[in-house]
């Protein structure tokens, strides 16, 4: 079996519950209905762990296109680290080994610093507790936690509970809380260096309100009307001296996995002296970031580096000499190029791209058609040349108009997509292309909340997989987004590379 293949991604076109909220079901779509009656169709899971996100988290366009093009589940940082902690593979991480071995062999302090909360945006309490477990396994007694309090992604007075939980855990692993400060100071991202200095002085010089009981110190802060985000520096003292400060040659692990609010503190500790602000880098620090914080940082270690997604569908087709076209309007152009190609900006050899400008309107309910018809016209022209072995197109309307929450506009968007599908698929059939129609996630399938108010978010619904083929015996199975690339290779008569762990859904 060796044909040409067209992949149509109808962005935000999920399979809804056929209730009032399901605009796709409630809007006349004669051509879409005909496709579903005529050709084999199944469902793809496009959210949560099926696309490398935390369980129950709705999919998005970036993650969706990454998985579609990669032909494998591409785990996001949080999930990747969660799996490493739960399956204990973190113990095999070479940078983890380096950090703990260095501290043990050189009798150095190891400092864990980061946001102590379960907000799940910047850090995970689970990761911190695991890091303290590893210190126990290595027999490191000089392990200290510097707690940045949240109150933005969590309740403003939830921090005391996290400190209690951490202290109870440290009773089993050893180690101590060394300091507490609000994220307002420790996690600034707007170059307010006077705030960062409050955190720096606490970490390096032990400057702050002295306390022997950290839970009591939190209670006192609340009593003064100061909540988690704004907690002033608190230093844990024993016999009148700080339990621990960061010293020359120590090990520091910054366990925030999101980079934006971890950069400034990392800069002043490791990258750049700021004498005018009274901050100097600490010599000889063994400094470990949970993920890459900034490509320009020198001399820091990264515990979980970005994966290179090799042998994506685009790269594989280029390597075997197949021609390909990636086409979309502005709003989704990065998705069918950069994300679809595994985070690569430049086109592969024999890859062509067409960008159609999105309409310049304030919100897309004002023009629900967007530039879909222009995309369709250019796409049909390209199909008629028979030049390309593989084409991927994104129709943006279901998602971008779905985000407005305006029901009538979403109806128009759905009608637009149905018309574009007709012209696109008929041209493909006339030129001997087989077609797969999918979505990257849901949106227009769930336009209302239960109380009837507009829902502007993505949905957790599965998405369609429709296989337009002349083969009357063809069947398709249910799957996940990672199964799309292997299915395209099946149409093209190519064996999928070992890096692709998805499977062809065409039987």
Curated annotation (Swiss-Prot):
> Which keywords appear in this protein's UniProt record, sorted alphabetically?
Glycolysis, Isomerase, Manganese, Metal-binding
Regions annotated as coiled coil: none
| Catalytic activity, EC | 5.4.2.12
Q: In the UniProt entry, which residues are flagged as the active site?
A: 61 (phosphoserine intermediate)
Q: How does it assemble?
A: Monomer.
Q: What pathway, per the record?
A: Carbohydrate degradation; glycolysis; pyruvate from D-glyceraldehyde 3-phosphate: step 3/5
Does the record carry NAD as a key word? no
Gene Ontology MF annotations: manganese ion binding; phosphoglycerate mutase activity
GO CC, sorted alphabetically, is: cytosol
Chain positions recorded as Mn(2+) 1 binding sites: 399, 403, 458
Q: Which organism is it from?
A: Parabacteroides distasonis (strain ATCC 8503 / DSM 20701 / CIP 104284 / JCM 5825 / NCTC 11152)
Name the source's superkingdom: Bacteria
Q: Which cofactor does it need?
A: Mn(2+)
Provide the protein name.
2,3-bisphosphoglycerate-independent phosphoglycerate mutase
Residues the entry annotates as binding Mn(2+) 2: 11, 61, 440-441
- Tell me the GO BP annotations in alphabetical order: glucose catabolic process; glycolytic process
Q: Does the keyword Isomerase apply?
A: yes
Q: Which family does it belong to?
A: Belongs to the BPG-independent phosphoglycerate mutase family.
Database matches in SUPFAM superfamilies: 2,3-Bisphosphoglycerate-independent phosphoglycerate mutase, substrate-binding domain, Alkaline phosphatase-like
Against Gene3D superfamilies, the record matches this protein to:
Alkaline Phosphatase, subunit A, BPG-independent phosphoglycerate mutase, domain B
Q: What does this protein do?
A: Catalyzes the interconversion of 2-phosphoglycerate and 3-phosphoglycerate.
Quote the cofactor binding remark: Binds 2 manganese ions per subunit.
Catalytic activity reads: (2R)-2-phosphoglycerate = (2R)-3-phosphoglycerate
